[in-house]
Amino acid sequence: MLPLTEENKHVAQLLFSSGTCPRCILRFCGVDLPAPYKHPSKELLNELQKFLEPEKPELILEAPNPPLKKIRLHEDGIDNLSEDGKEGVSVTEDESMAEKPSKLRVCNVCLGILQEFCEKGFITKVCQKVEASGFEFTSVVLSVSFPPQLSVREHAAWLLVKQEMGKQSLSLGRNDVVQLKEAYKWITHPLFSEELGVPTDGKSLFEVSVVFAHPETAEDCHFLGEVCRDCFKPAKNKQSVFTRMAVLKALSKIKEEDFLGQFPCPPNSPKTVCTVLEVECTHGAVFVAGRYNKYSRNLPQTPWIIDGERKMESSVEELISDHLLAVFRAESFNFSSSGREDVDVRTLGNGRPFAVELLNPHRVHFTSQEMKELQQTINKSSDKIQVRDLQLVTREAIGHMKEGEEEKTKTYSALIWTNRAIQKKDIGFLDDLKDLKIDQKTPLRVLHRRPLAVRTRAIHSMKTHYLDEHHFRLHLKTQAGTYIKEFVHGDFGRTKPNLGSLMNVTADILELDVESVDVDWPPALDD
C-alpha cells in the first residue's frame, strides 16, 4: 500500500496523467519515509494505478434475481457475502477499469533517474565497475551528479502542484517536496551497501561518483540565461555556464509568471532516459610521516629543475616518495617537511620530520610490519638518505609538524673559515653569548621565492672548537627559521650582527650539518 491519502489523490492523478513517475509523485505528495521508495518501479506503478482507480460500484443482488450487467465473480467467499450474510455477487462496469500502459513512460520530471537508475540491475553494473577499479575500501560514499535541467523541470512540476493545491485552499512550500537526491539516496544506499559488502558513510574517504546527462533536454535551461543573465557567468574549468547552482540561483529569482511564460507546465514528456556519462572511483588522500637523514652534500630536498632542465639527478623527496607512490598505487603526491636544508647541507641526528600526502591511493591498508618493510626498502635503495619512524598518520596530525614552527629550535654544526689568523682565545667569547638577537633581511639567494622582509631571529647558544689558525667548528642552537650561512658571512651586511662582525673578521662557512630538528613529531617507533 502506498502511504497516500484521499487528499493526495487529485495531485497524484494530475502528475500521473502528465507523465510523472510514481516515485516523483511520492516526492510531490511529501512522502518523507524511505520505505515506499524502495519498492521496485513496476510494483509502485501497479500500486499507484490501484490507488487512482475510481471506486468500483458494487451491487449486492439477491441470488434468485438475474444480474442486469456483466458481473465479476469473486473467488473469495468473504467478498461474496452481503452485509446480512447472504451470498451475493459484485457487479463492475467494464468502462470503469483504468487503462494500464504496457510500457513505462520516461518521467517528465526526473527523466528516468528514479525509474531505471535506482533499480538493482543498474546498481549491480556500477558495483562491478567499482570492484574492477582495484581500490581498497571499508566504506563508501555515493556521489551523484544530475543534469541541471532537472531543477527546471522540478520547478515546473512544483508550480503545477502548488496552483492545483491552491484551488483547494492548500499550500505546498518548496521544502515540502522531497529532494530528488534524498529519494535517490534512500533507494540506492542500501543496495550499494549490500552489493559491495561495506556500509555507506557520508564521511568515507572512498567515493563512487556517477554523472548523468540528458542531451535531449539540454536546452531546457537556456531561457534562464536570457531572463537572469547575472546568474550565468563564464567560469574557468566549466564546460557550460548552466551549472546546477547557477540554475537554482536563477530559479530562486525568476517570477512565477515569467517562468510559466517560458517553460511548459507540466513539463513535456521526453522520449529518452538519462545516460550515464561516467562512473568514477576516487579515494581521499592518505598521509605517511617519518624522519629522514640526508648524508649527501650533493642532493637537494626537492627536484632541482631550472627552465625545464634538471640540475640534479635526484632529490630527498623523490628517493622517499617514489617508493610510497608505487606501493600505495597513488596517482601523485605532495611532500612537506619541518623546514628544509640546502643542497650541500647534511641532516644528521634523529633526522628531519616529513610528511607525504598520497593522492587517490588504490591501496590504503598496511600493518605496522608492512610499514617497517617499506622503510627498509627505501633505506636499501640509496646511501644518500635514510628514513625512520615511517607511519600512517591523519591529515590533522600533519598540523603538529607545522605548529609553532618558528618557536621550535634547531642545532647545527658548522666548519668556519676566517680570513685572518685566529687563536683559541679569539673565539672563546662566543661560548658565553646567550639568546643573541639578530635581524636578517631576506637572503639574496632566496629572494626569488620569499618576499623581502626583515626577520628577527635568536641564536640561543654557541659552542666553539678550535681547529687551526683559520678554522674552527661552531655548534649553534637557534630559533627555527634562522639562516645560518648568512649569520656566518653576513650576506653583504643584510644580517646584523653576524659572526664576522662579532669577531671583526671576514668569515665564511665551509660545511654545515643539521644535527637536530627539535620537533616532537612524528612519534618515535621501536626498531
Swiss-Prot record:
Record EC number: 5.4.99.25
Catalytic activity: uridine(55) in tRNA = pseudouridine(55) in tRNA; uridine(54) in tRNA = pseudouridine(54) in tRNA
Chief location of this protein within or outside the cell: nucleus
RNA binding thumb loop: annotated span: 440-455
UniProt: Zn(2+) binding residues: C21, C24, C107, C110
MF-aspect GO terms: metal ion binding; primary miRNA binding; pseudouridine synthase activity; tRNA pseudouridine synthase activity; tRNA pseudouridine(55) synthase activity
Subcellular localization, as worded in the UniProt entry: Nucleus; Cytoplasm; Mitochondrion
Signal peptide stretch: none
Leading EC class: isomerase
InterPro entries membership: PsdUridine_synth_cat_dom_sf, Pus10-like, Pus10-like_C, Pus10_N_euk
Residue(s) carrying Phosphoserine: S82
Coiled-coil regions listed in the entry: 42-87
GO cellular component, one term: cytoplasm
Post-translational modification as stated in the protein's UniProt record: Proteolytically cleaved during TRAIL-induced cell death. Cleaved, in vitro, either by caspase-3 (CASP3) or caspase-8 (CASP8).
Residue ranges, annotated region (RNA binding forefinger loop): 302-315
GO biological process: primary miRNA processing; tRNA pseudouridine synthesis
Keywords for the protein's UniProt record, in alphabetical order: Coiled coil, Cytoplasm, Isomerase, Metal-binding, Mitochondrion, Nucleus, Phosphoprotein, tRNA processing, Zinc
Active-site annotation: D342 (nucleophile)
NCBIfam families (alphabetical): pseudo_Pus10arc
Family indicated by similarity: Belongs to the pseudouridine synthase Pus10 family.
Assembly: Interacts with components of the microprocessor complex DROSHA and DGCR8.
Its job: Protein with different functions depending on its subcellular location: involved in miRNA processing in the nucleus and acts as a tRNA pseudouridylate synthase in the cytoplasm. In the cytoplasm, acts as a pseudouridylate synthase by catalyzing synthesis of pseudouridine(54) and pseudouridine(55) from uracil-54 and uracil-55, respectively, in the psi GC loop of a subset of tRNAs. tRNA pseudouridylate synthase activity is enhanced by the presence of 1-methyladenosine at position 53-61 of tRNAs. Does not show tRNA pseudouridylate synthase activity in the nucleus.
Matching PANTHER family: TRNA PSEUDOURIDINE SYNTHASE PUS10 (PTHR21568:SF0)
Protein name per UniProt: tRNA pseudouridine synthase Pus10
Organism: Mus musculus (Mouse)
Gene: Pus10
